[in-house]
Amino acid sequence: MIRTGKQYLESLNDGRNVWVGNEKIDNVATHPKTRDYAQRHADFYDLHHRPDLQDVMTFVDKDGERRTMQWFGHYDKEQLRRKRKYHETIMREMAGASFPRTPDVNNYVLQTYIDDPSPWETQTIGAEGKVKAKNIVDFVNFAKKHDLNCAPQFVDPQMDRSNPDAQQRSPGLRVIEKNDKGIVVSGVKAIGTGVAFADWIHIGVFFRPGIPGDQIIFAATPVNTPGVTIVCRESVVKEDPIEHPLASQGDELDGMTVFDNVFIPWSHVFHLGNPEHAKLYPQRVFDWLHYHALIRQSVRAELMAGLAILITEHIGTNKIPAVQTRVAKLIGFHQAMLAHIVASEELGFHTPGGAYKPNILIYDFGRALYLENFSQMIYELVDLSGRSALIFASEDQWNDEALNGWFERMNNGPVGQPHDRVKIGRVIRDLFLTDWGNRLFVFENFNGTPLQAIRMLTMQRAEFSAAGPYGTLARKVCGIELTEGHDSEYKATAGYAQALDSARHQEKLALSGTMTV
Protein backbone atom coordinates (compact mmCIF):
# COMPACT_ATOMS: atom_id res chain seq x y z
CA MET A 1 0.00 0.00 0.00
CA ILE A 2 1.17 3.51 -0.82
CA ARG A 3 -0.96 5.78 1.31
CA THR A 4 -2.43 8.99 -0.08
CA GLY A 5 -2.67 12.32 1.68
CA LYS A 6 -6.45 12.06 1.65
CA GLN A 7 -6.35 8.67 3.38
CA TYR A 8 -3.97 10.04 5.98
CA LEU A 9 -6.13 13.08 6.79
CA GLU A 10 -9.26 10.94 7.06
CA SER A 11 -7.48 8.62 9.50
CA LEU A 12 -6.83 11.47 11.95
CA ASN A 13 -10.52 11.83 12.83
CA ASP A 14 -10.37 8.81 15.12
CA GLY A 15 -11.25 10.18 18.54
CA ARG A 16 -7.69 10.83 19.67
CA ASN A 17 -7.39 12.94 22.80
CA VAL A 18 -5.21 15.99 22.01
CA TRP A 19 -4.60 19.31 23.71
CA VAL A 20 -2.75 22.24 22.10
CA GLY A 21 -2.09 24.98 24.62
CA ASN A 22 -5.44 25.84 26.19
CA GLU A 23 -7.53 24.20 23.49
CA LYS A 24 -8.90 20.68 23.18
CA ILE A 25 -8.62 19.58 19.54
CA ASP A 26 -11.71 17.95 18.07
CA ASN A 27 -10.11 16.87 14.79
CA VAL A 28 -6.37 17.22 14.17
CA ALA A 29 -6.97 17.36 10.40
CA THR A 30 -9.29 20.38 10.53
CA HIS A 31 -8.57 22.41 13.68
CA PRO A 32 -6.82 25.75 12.94
CA LYS A 33 -3.95 24.98 15.32
CA THR A 34 -3.14 21.59 13.78
CA ARG A 35 -4.52 21.45 10.25
CA ASP A 36 -1.51 23.05 8.55
CA TYR A 37 0.97 20.50 9.84
CA ALA A 38 -1.51 17.70 9.20
CA GLN A 39 -1.56 18.91 5.60
CA ARG A 40 2.25 18.76 5.49
CA HIS A 41 2.04 15.08 6.40
CA ALA A 42 -0.58 14.64 3.69
CA ASP A 43 1.83 16.34 1.29
CA PHE A 44 4.49 13.87 2.41
CA TYR A 45 2.30 10.92 1.44
CA ASP A 46 1.26 12.54 -1.84
CA LEU A 47 4.91 13.04 -2.83
CA HIS A 48 5.09 9.27 -3.25
CA HIS A 49 2.41 9.44 -5.96
CA ARG A 50 4.20 11.96 -8.17
CA PRO A 51 5.13 10.23 -11.44
CA ASP A 52 8.32 12.27 -11.82
CA LEU A 53 9.53 11.08 -8.40
CA GLN A 54 8.44 7.45 -8.57
CA ASP A 55 11.96 6.00 -8.74
CA VAL A 56 13.16 8.24 -5.90
CA MET A 57 10.17 7.91 -3.58
CA THR A 58 9.13 4.28 -4.08
CA PHE A 59 10.57 0.82 -4.65
CA VAL A 60 9.29 -2.63 -5.58
CA ASP A 61 9.68 -5.12 -2.73
CA LYS A 62 10.56 -8.81 -2.98
CA ASP A 63 6.87 -9.68 -3.35
CA GLY A 64 6.54 -7.41 -6.36
CA GLU A 65 4.56 -4.72 -4.54
CA ARG A 66 5.49 -1.06 -4.87
CA ARG A 67 5.97 0.63 -1.50
CA THR A 68 7.22 3.94 -0.14
CA MET A 69 10.98 4.19 0.27
CA GLN A 70 10.65 4.64 4.01
CA TRP A 71 10.42 0.82 4.16
CA PHE A 72 13.38 0.23 1.84
CA GLY A 73 16.12 -2.00 3.25
CA HIS A 74 19.68 -1.05 2.34
CA TYR A 75 22.21 -3.88 2.21
CA ASP A 76 25.10 -2.18 0.46
CA LYS A 77 26.59 1.28 0.12
CA GLU A 78 24.68 2.27 -3.01
CA GLN A 79 21.36 1.22 -1.50
CA LEU A 80 22.13 3.35 1.57
CA ARG A 81 22.84 6.31 -0.69
CA ARG A 82 19.58 5.67 -2.51
CA LYS A 83 17.83 5.91 0.85
CA ARG A 84 19.67 9.15 1.58
CA LYS A 85 18.51 10.64 -1.72
CA TYR A 86 14.95 9.77 -0.70
CA HIS A 87 15.27 11.61 2.61
CA GLU A 88 16.95 14.58 0.94
CA THR A 89 14.18 14.82 -1.64
CA ILE A 90 11.54 15.05 1.09
CA MET A 91 13.52 17.78 2.84
CA ARG A 92 13.97 19.80 -0.34
CA GLU A 93 10.30 19.47 -1.26
CA MET A 94 9.08 20.37 2.23
CA ALA A 95 10.32 23.80 3.33
CA GLY A 96 14.04 23.11 3.22
CA ALA A 97 14.19 20.53 6.03
CA SER A 98 12.02 22.61 8.37
CA PHE A 99 10.00 19.58 9.52
CA PRO A 100 12.36 17.13 11.24
CA ARG A 101 9.74 14.53 12.22
CA THR A 102 8.10 13.35 9.01
CA PRO A 103 6.96 9.70 8.92
CA ASP A 104 10.12 8.49 7.13
CA VAL A 105 12.20 9.66 10.10
CA ASN A 106 9.91 8.19 12.73
CA ASN A 107 9.74 4.80 11.07
CA TYR A 108 13.51 4.64 10.53
CA VAL A 109 13.88 4.07 14.29
CA LEU A 110 12.24 0.65 13.90
CA GLN A 111 15.26 -0.51 11.88
CA THR A 112 17.30 -1.30 15.01
CA TYR A 113 14.65 -3.70 16.29
CA ILE A 114 14.03 -5.51 13.02
CA ASP A 115 17.75 -5.85 12.31
CA ASP A 116 18.28 -8.14 15.31
CA PRO A 117 15.04 -8.76 17.22
CA SER A 118 16.15 -11.75 19.29
CA PRO A 119 17.92 -9.87 22.15
CA TRP A 120 14.75 -7.92 22.84
CA GLU A 121 13.08 -11.23 23.66
CA THR A 122 15.95 -13.04 25.38
CA GLN A 123 16.86 -10.08 27.60
CA THR A 124 13.30 -9.44 28.81
CA ILE A 125 12.76 -9.88 32.54
CA GLY A 126 9.41 -10.71 34.11
CA ALA A 127 7.52 -11.57 30.93
CA GLU A 128 9.31 -14.63 29.60
CA GLY A 129 7.28 -16.43 26.96
CA LYS A 130 5.08 -13.38 26.43
CA VAL A 131 7.51 -10.95 24.79
CA LYS A 132 8.65 -12.53 21.55
CA ALA A 133 11.00 -11.41 18.78
CA LYS A 134 8.12 -12.27 16.46
CA ASN A 135 6.18 -9.33 17.95
CA ILE A 136 8.73 -6.94 16.45
CA VAL A 137 8.72 -8.60 13.04
CA ASP A 138 4.93 -8.72 12.91
CA PHE A 139 4.53 -5.10 13.98
CA VAL A 140 7.03 -3.73 11.46
CA ASN A 141 5.36 -5.74 8.69
CA PHE A 142 1.98 -4.39 9.82
CA ALA A 143 3.25 -0.79 9.77
CA LYS A 144 4.80 -1.34 6.35
CA LYS A 145 1.66 -2.92 4.92
CA HIS A 146 -0.48 0.05 5.97
CA ASP A 147 2.21 2.74 5.43
CA LEU A 148 1.79 4.01 8.98
CA ASN A 149 3.52 6.76 10.92
CA CYS A 150 4.94 5.43 14.20
CA ALA A 151 6.22 8.34 16.29
CA PRO A 152 8.85 7.52 18.93
CA GLN A 153 8.36 8.75 22.49
CA PHE A 154 11.18 7.77 24.85
CA VAL A 155 11.99 10.71 27.14
CA ASP A 156 10.80 10.57 30.76
CA PRO A 157 10.09 13.47 33.17
CA GLN A 158 12.99 15.35 34.73
CA MET A 159 13.41 14.45 38.38
CA ASP A 160 15.31 15.79 41.37
CA ARG A 161 18.76 14.55 40.43
CA SER A 162 20.11 15.26 43.90
CA ASN A 163 17.79 12.60 45.34
CA PRO A 164 18.98 9.00 44.84
CA ASP A 165 15.42 7.72 45.25
CA ALA A 166 13.92 10.09 42.69
CA GLN A 167 13.56 7.49 39.94
CA GLN A 168 11.50 5.25 42.19
CA ARG A 169 8.98 8.06 42.71
CA SER A 170 9.03 9.27 39.12
CA PRO A 171 5.69 9.75 37.32
CA GLY A 172 7.39 8.19 34.30
CA LEU A 173 5.54 5.47 32.44
CA ARG A 174 5.57 2.10 34.20
CA VAL A 175 3.88 -1.29 34.09
CA ILE A 176 1.19 -1.52 36.77
CA GLU A 177 -0.35 -4.84 35.73
CA LYS A 178 0.43 -7.93 33.68
CA ASN A 179 -2.14 -10.49 32.66
CA ASP A 180 -2.63 -13.20 30.05
CA LYS A 181 -3.66 -10.68 27.40
CA GLY A 182 -1.05 -7.98 27.89
CA ILE A 183 0.14 -5.20 30.16
CA VAL A 184 -1.44 -2.11 31.69
CA VAL A 185 0.74 1.00 31.89
CA SER A 186 0.35 4.36 33.60
CA GLY A 187 2.52 7.44 33.72
CA VAL A 188 4.00 10.12 31.53
CA LYS A 189 6.34 10.33 28.58
CA ALA A 190 7.65 13.86 28.84
CA ILE A 191 8.69 14.78 25.30
CA GLY A 192 7.62 13.69 21.86
CA THR A 193 7.48 15.57 18.58
CA GLY A 194 4.55 15.26 16.21
CA VAL A 195 2.91 12.49 18.23
CA ALA A 196 -0.50 14.13 17.78
CA PHE A 197 -0.15 13.55 14.02
CA ALA A 198 1.02 9.93 14.17
CA ASP A 199 -0.89 6.68 13.82
CA TRP A 200 1.00 4.80 16.54
CA ILE A 201 3.17 5.78 19.50
CA HIS A 202 6.46 3.89 19.60
CA ILE A 203 7.16 3.72 23.33
CA GLY A 204 10.70 3.37 24.62
CA VAL A 205 12.93 4.54 27.43
CA PHE A 206 16.30 6.22 27.95
CA PHE A 207 18.28 4.52 30.68
CA ARG A 208 18.87 6.53 33.84
CA PRO A 209 20.84 5.36 36.90
CA GLY A 210 18.42 3.94 39.42
CA ILE A 211 15.58 3.38 36.97
CA PRO A 212 13.36 0.51 38.18
CA GLY A 213 12.56 -2.44 35.96
CA ASP A 214 8.85 -1.63 35.78
CA GLN A 215 9.74 1.54 33.81
CA ILE A 216 11.65 -0.39 31.14
CA ILE A 217 9.02 -0.61 28.40
CA PHE A 218 9.51 -0.88 24.65
CA ALA A 219 6.15 -1.25 22.92
CA ALA A 220 3.65 0.36 20.54
CA THR A 221 0.07 1.55 20.90
CA PRO A 222 -2.33 3.49 18.65
CA VAL A 223 -2.52 7.22 19.30
CA ASN A 224 -6.28 6.94 19.92
CA THR A 225 -5.96 4.18 22.53
CA PRO A 226 -8.33 4.79 25.47
CA GLY A 227 -6.42 6.46 28.30
CA VAL A 228 -3.87 8.18 26.05
CA THR A 229 -3.85 11.99 26.20
CA ILE A 230 -1.39 14.06 24.16
CA VAL A 231 -0.65 17.43 25.76
CA CYS A 232 1.12 19.77 23.31
CA ARG A 233 2.71 23.14 23.95
CA GLU A 234 1.02 26.19 22.45
CA SER A 235 1.24 26.47 18.68
CA VAL A 236 3.60 28.95 17.04
CA VAL A 237 2.20 28.56 13.52
CA LYS A 238 1.60 31.82 11.61
CA GLU A 239 -1.56 32.48 9.62
CA ASP A 240 -0.41 34.44 6.57
CA PRO A 241 1.41 32.31 3.95
CA ILE A 242 2.69 35.39 2.11
CA GLU A 243 4.18 37.18 5.11
CA HIS A 244 5.38 33.92 6.65
CA PRO A 245 6.16 31.49 3.81
CA LEU A 246 7.64 28.87 6.16
CA ALA A 247 6.12 29.57 9.58
CA SER A 248 2.60 29.34 8.11
CA GLN A 249 3.18 25.79 6.91
CA GLY A 250 2.57 24.22 10.28
CA ASP A 251 3.93 23.44 13.72
CA GLU A 252 5.12 19.93 14.59
CA LEU A 253 3.96 20.46 18.17
CA ASP A 254 6.25 18.96 20.77
CA GLY A 255 4.44 17.70 23.83
CA MET A 256 4.03 15.12 26.54
CA THR A 257 1.77 12.08 26.61
CA VAL A 258 -0.18 10.90 29.63
CA PHE A 259 -1.02 7.19 29.80
CA ASP A 260 -3.83 6.53 32.27
CA ASN A 261 -4.30 2.77 32.76
CA VAL A 262 -3.57 2.02 29.11
CA PHE A 263 -3.80 -1.59 27.98
CA ILE A 264 -1.20 -2.89 25.50
CA PRO A 265 -1.56 -6.46 24.19
CA TRP A 266 1.47 -8.75 24.33
CA SER A 267 1.65 -8.72 20.54
CA HIS A 268 2.65 -5.05 20.68
CA VAL A 269 5.24 -5.38 23.47
CA PHE A 270 8.88 -5.55 22.29
CA HIS A 271 10.78 -5.68 25.59
CA LEU A 272 10.19 -5.35 29.33
CA GLY A 273 11.96 -5.11 32.63
CA ASN A 274 15.72 -5.11 32.01
CA PRO A 275 17.59 -1.87 32.85
CA GLU A 276 20.90 -3.39 31.73
CA HIS A 277 19.46 -4.05 28.27
CA ALA A 278 17.97 -0.55 28.10
CA LYS A 279 21.36 0.88 29.10
CA LEU A 280 22.78 -0.33 25.78
CA TYR A 281 20.26 1.55 23.66
CA PRO A 282 20.25 5.31 24.30
CA GLN A 283 21.88 5.78 20.90
CA ARG A 284 21.57 2.39 19.21
CA VAL A 285 17.79 2.54 18.82
CA PHE A 286 18.16 6.04 17.39
CA ASP A 287 21.23 5.42 15.19
CA TRP A 288 19.15 5.62 12.04
CA LEU A 289 17.37 8.76 13.19
CA HIS A 290 20.79 10.28 13.95
CA TYR A 291 22.05 9.46 10.47
CA HIS A 292 18.94 11.16 9.14
CA ALA A 293 19.66 14.13 11.44
CA LEU A 294 23.07 14.59 9.83
CA ILE A 295 21.44 14.54 6.39
CA ARG A 296 18.96 17.18 7.57
CA GLN A 297 21.75 19.29 9.05
CA SER A 298 23.62 19.15 5.76
CA VAL A 299 20.54 20.35 3.87
CA ARG A 300 20.02 23.11 6.43
CA ALA A 301 23.65 24.18 6.10
CA GLU A 302 23.22 24.25 2.32
CA LEU A 303 20.11 26.41 2.70
CA MET A 304 21.92 28.86 4.99
CA ALA A 305 24.81 29.15 2.53
CA GLY A 306 22.39 29.68 -0.35
CA LEU A 307 20.49 32.37 1.53
CA ALA A 308 23.76 34.15 2.29
CA ILE A 309 24.64 34.12 -1.40
CA LEU A 310 21.18 35.37 -2.42
CA ILE A 311 21.00 38.23 0.05
CA THR A 312 24.56 39.49 -0.46
CA GLU A 313 24.14 39.41 -4.24
CA HIS A 314 20.85 41.28 -3.96
CA ILE A 315 22.18 44.05 -1.74
CA GLY A 316 25.41 44.27 -3.73
CA THR A 317 27.93 43.34 -1.02
CA ASN A 318 28.96 39.99 -2.50
CA LYS A 319 32.07 41.38 -4.22
CA ILE A 320 33.50 42.86 -1.02
CA PRO A 321 36.39 40.60 0.13
CA ALA A 322 35.38 40.73 3.79
CA VAL A 323 31.85 39.63 2.86
CA GLN A 324 33.18 36.85 0.62
CA THR A 325 35.22 35.42 3.49
CA ARG A 326 32.13 35.39 5.70
CA VAL A 327 30.01 33.69 3.05
CA ALA A 328 32.88 31.21 2.69
CA LYS A 329 32.33 30.21 6.34
CA LEU A 330 28.79 29.12 5.53
CA ILE A 331 29.86 27.27 2.39
CA GLY A 332 32.69 25.57 4.27
CA PHE A 333 30.25 24.60 7.02
CA HIS A 334 28.02 22.87 4.49
CA GLN A 335 31.00 21.12 2.90
CA ALA A 336 32.07 19.84 6.32
CA MET A 337 28.61 18.40 6.98
CA LEU A 338 28.54 16.78 3.55
CA ALA A 339 32.00 15.31 4.17
CA HIS A 340 30.77 13.63 7.36
CA ILE A 341 27.86 12.06 5.49
CA VAL A 342 30.00 10.76 2.64
CA ALA A 343 32.74 9.48 4.96
CA SER A 344 30.25 7.72 7.24
CA GLU A 345 28.75 5.95 4.24
CA GLU A 346 32.13 5.11 2.72
CA LEU A 347 33.37 3.56 5.98
CA GLY A 348 30.13 1.79 6.84
CA PHE A 349 29.68 -1.83 7.87
CA HIS A 350 27.13 -4.65 7.89
CA THR A 351 24.91 -5.28 10.90
CA PRO A 352 23.80 -8.72 12.16
CA GLY A 353 20.71 -8.43 9.98
CA GLY A 354 22.79 -7.64 6.90
CA ALA A 355 21.89 -3.94 6.69
CA TYR A 356 24.62 -1.62 5.47
CA LYS A 357 25.06 0.94 8.23
CA PRO A 358 27.06 4.18 8.06
CA ASN A 359 29.97 4.66 10.44
CA ILE A 360 28.39 5.85 13.68
CA LEU A 361 31.45 7.64 15.06
CA ILE A 362 31.74 9.78 11.95
CA TYR A 363 28.09 10.77 11.70
CA ASP A 364 27.61 11.30 15.43
CA PHE A 365 30.68 13.51 15.67
CA GLY A 366 29.36 15.22 12.53
CA ARG A 367 26.18 16.00 14.44
CA ALA A 368 28.31 17.37 17.28
CA LEU A 369 30.20 19.58 14.83
CA TYR A 370 26.92 21.01 13.55
CA LEU A 371 25.58 21.79 17.02
CA GLU A 372 28.86 23.36 18.05
CA ASN A 373 28.88 25.75 15.09
CA PHE A 374 25.39 26.39 13.76
CA SER A 375 24.65 29.27 16.16
CA GLN A 376 27.65 31.10 14.73
CA MET A 377 26.50 30.33 11.19
CA ILE A 378 23.05 31.76 11.94
CA TYR A 379 24.69 34.90 13.32
CA GLU A 380 26.80 35.26 10.16
CA LEU A 381 23.75 34.92 7.90
CA VAL A 382 21.58 37.37 9.85
CA ASP A 383 24.43 39.86 10.13
CA LEU A 384 25.18 39.62 6.40
CA SER A 385 21.50 40.34 5.75
CA GLY A 386 21.55 43.61 7.66
CA ARG A 387 18.11 45.17 7.99
CA SER A 388 16.82 42.98 5.15
CA ALA A 389 16.11 40.09 7.52
CA LEU A 390 13.84 42.06 9.80
CA ILE A 391 12.73 45.44 8.46
CA PHE A 392 10.83 45.19 5.21
CA ALA A 393 7.42 46.09 3.85
CA SER A 394 4.42 43.86 4.40
CA GLU A 395 2.59 42.76 1.28
CA ASP A 396 -0.19 45.31 1.70
CA GLN A 397 2.34 48.06 2.32
CA TRP A 398 4.28 47.04 -0.78
CA ASN A 399 1.14 47.13 -2.91
CA ASP A 400 0.01 50.52 -1.60
CA GLU A 401 0.06 52.96 -4.51
CA ALA A 402 1.59 55.76 -2.48
CA LEU A 403 4.35 53.62 -0.96
CA ASN A 404 5.27 51.18 -3.70
CA GLY A 405 7.62 53.48 -5.55
CA TRP A 406 9.66 54.13 -2.42
CA PHE A 407 9.92 50.43 -1.65
CA GLU A 408 10.97 49.64 -5.22
CA ARG A 409 13.81 52.17 -4.98
CA MET A 410 14.85 51.06 -1.48
CA ASN A 411 15.13 47.40 -2.51
CA ASN A 412 16.64 47.83 -5.95
CA GLY A 413 19.86 45.85 -6.30
CA PRO A 414 22.35 44.69 -8.94
CA VAL A 415 20.47 41.41 -9.51
CA GLY A 416 16.85 40.27 -9.35
CA GLN A 417 13.67 42.23 -8.75
CA PRO A 418 13.16 44.60 -5.79
CA HIS A 419 10.43 42.40 -4.33
CA ASP A 420 12.83 39.42 -4.34
CA ARG A 421 14.69 40.96 -1.42
CA VAL A 422 11.49 40.96 0.61
CA LYS A 423 10.94 37.29 -0.22
CA ILE A 424 14.47 36.42 0.89
CA GLY A 425 14.03 38.46 4.06
CA ARG A 426 10.79 36.70 4.94
CA VAL A 427 12.44 33.29 4.75
CA ILE A 428 15.43 34.36 6.86
CA ARG A 429 13.09 35.97 9.40
CA ASP A 430 10.89 32.87 9.62
CA LEU A 431 13.87 30.56 10.08
CA PHE A 432 15.87 32.57 12.59
CA LEU A 433 13.94 35.57 13.97
CA THR A 434 10.52 34.20 14.97
CA ASP A 435 9.23 31.95 17.73
CA TRP A 436 8.57 29.36 15.00
CA GLY A 437 12.21 29.49 13.95
CA ASN A 438 13.46 29.56 17.53
CA ARG A 439 11.53 26.39 18.21
CA LEU A 440 13.48 24.74 15.37
CA PHE A 441 16.69 26.04 16.94
CA VAL A 442 15.83 24.50 20.30
CA PHE A 443 14.71 21.27 18.66
CA GLU A 444 18.01 20.97 16.82
CA ASN A 445 19.92 21.52 20.05
CA PHE A 446 18.10 18.86 22.04
CA ASN A 447 16.52 16.25 19.77
CA GLY A 448 18.34 12.95 19.67
CA THR A 449 20.50 14.11 22.61
CA PRO A 450 22.21 17.52 23.02
CA LEU A 451 25.84 18.26 22.22
CA GLN A 452 27.54 16.99 25.38
CA ALA A 453 25.35 13.88 25.50
CA ILE A 454 26.26 13.10 21.88
CA ARG A 455 29.93 13.17 22.81
CA MET A 456 29.47 11.20 26.02
CA LEU A 457 27.33 8.47 24.44
CA THR A 458 29.47 8.21 21.32
CA MET A 459 32.53 7.60 23.52
CA GLN A 460 30.70 4.49 24.73
CA ARG A 461 30.44 3.06 21.21
CA ALA A 462 34.09 2.03 20.69
CA GLU A 463 37.28 1.20 22.59
CA PHE A 464 38.79 4.54 23.52
CA SER A 465 41.22 3.29 26.16
CA ALA A 466 44.98 2.96 25.63
CA ALA A 467 44.27 -0.58 24.40
CA GLY A 468 42.12 0.69 21.56
CA PRO A 469 43.06 1.78 18.04
CA TYR A 470 43.64 5.40 19.06
CA GLY A 471 46.25 4.31 21.59
CA THR A 472 48.14 2.04 19.20
CA LEU A 473 50.23 4.65 17.41
CA ALA A 474 50.74 6.75 20.54
CA ARG A 475 52.01 3.71 22.47
CA LYS A 476 54.37 2.89 19.63
CA VAL A 477 55.77 6.42 19.45
CA CYS A 478 56.15 6.57 23.24
CA GLY A 479 57.66 3.10 23.44
CA ILE A 480 55.02 1.85 25.87
CA GLU A 481 54.07 -1.82 26.11
CA LEU A 482 50.41 -2.72 26.55
CA THR A 483 49.66 -4.13 29.98
CA GLU A 484 46.52 -5.48 31.61
CA GLY A 485 43.93 -3.05 32.91
CA HIS A 486 43.86 -0.69 29.95
CA ASP A 487 40.52 -1.85 28.54
CA SER A 488 37.51 0.41 28.96
CA GLU A 489 33.97 -0.65 29.79
CA TYR A 490 33.32 -1.07 26.08
CA LYS A 491 35.08 -4.45 26.08
CA ALA A 492 32.42 -5.69 28.51
CA THR A 493 29.53 -4.42 26.39
CA ALA A 494 27.20 -7.19 25.23
CA GLY A 495 28.27 -8.60 21.88
CA TYR A 496 24.82 -8.15 20.37
CA ALA A 497 25.06 -4.43 21.10
CA GLN A 498 28.64 -4.10 19.85
CA ALA A 499 27.51 -5.68 16.59
CA LEU A 500 25.40 -2.57 15.95
CA ASP A 501 28.49 -0.35 16.26
CA SER A 502 31.18 0.36 13.70
CA ALA A 503 33.90 -0.18 16.30
CA ARG A 504 34.83 -3.72 15.22
CA HIS A 505 35.19 -2.67 11.61
CA GLN A 506 37.25 0.36 12.59
CA GLU A 507 39.53 -1.71 14.80
CA LYS A 508 40.31 -4.01 11.88
CA LEU A 509 41.13 -0.98 9.73
CA ALA A 510 43.34 0.48 12.43
CA LEU A 511 45.22 -2.75 13.10
CA SER A 512 45.84 -3.22 9.39
CA GLY A 513 47.28 0.29 9.23
CA THR A 514 44.56 1.46 6.85
CA MET A 515 43.27 4.32 8.98
CA THR A 516 42.44 5.26 12.55
CA VAL A 517 38.74 5.95 12.09
Curated annotation (Swiss-Prot):
Any matching Pfam family: HpaB_N
Inducers of expression: Induced by 2,4,6-TCP and subject to catabolic repression by glutamate.
Pathway: Aromatic compound metabolism; Xenobiotic degradation
Gene3D superfamilies (alphabetical): 4-hydroxybutyryl-coa dehydratase, domain 1 (1.10.3140.10), Butyryl-CoA Dehydrogenase, subunit A, domain 2 (2.40.110.10), Butyryl-CoA Dehydrogenase, subunit A, domain 3 (1.20.140.10)
Catalytic activity: 2,4,6-trichlorophenol + FADH2 + O2 = 2-chloro-6-hydroxy-1,4-benzoquinone + FAD + 2 chloride + 3 H(+); 2,4,6-trichlorophenol + FADH2 + O2 = 2,6-dichlorobenzoquinone + FAD + chloride + H2O + H(+); 2,6-dichlorobenzoquinone + H2O = 2-chloro-6-hydroxy-1,4-benzoquinone + chloride + 2 H(+)
Enzyme category, top tier: oxidoreductase
Temperature notes for this entry: Optimum temperature is 33 degrees Celsius.
E.C. number(s) listed in UniProt: 1.14.14.173
Disrupted-gene phenotype: Disruption mutant cannot degrade 2,4,6-TCP. Inactivation completely prevents removal of the chlorophenol.
GO terms, biological process: catabolic process
InterPro entries, alphabetized: Acyl-CoA_Oxase/DH_mid-dom_sf, AcylCo_DH-like_C, AcylCoA_DH/oxidase_NM_dom_sf, HpaB/PvcC/4-BUDH, HpaB/PvcC/4-BUDH_C, HpaB/PvcC/4-BUDH_N
Family per record: Belongs to the FADH(2)-utilizing monooxygenase family.
UniProt function note: Involved in the degradation of 2,4,6-trichlorophenol (2,4,6-TCP). Catalyzes the conversion of 2,4,6-TCP to 6-chlorohydroxyquinol (6-CHQ). The monooxygenase oxidizes 2,4,6-TCP to 2,6-dichloroquinone (2,6-DCBQ), which remains with the enzyme and is hydrolyzed to 2-chlorohydroxyquinone. 2-chlorohydroxyquinone is chemically reduced by ascorbate and NADH to 6-chlorohydroxyquinol (6-CHQ).
Name the UniProt record assigns to this protein: 2,4,6-trichlorophenol monooxygenase
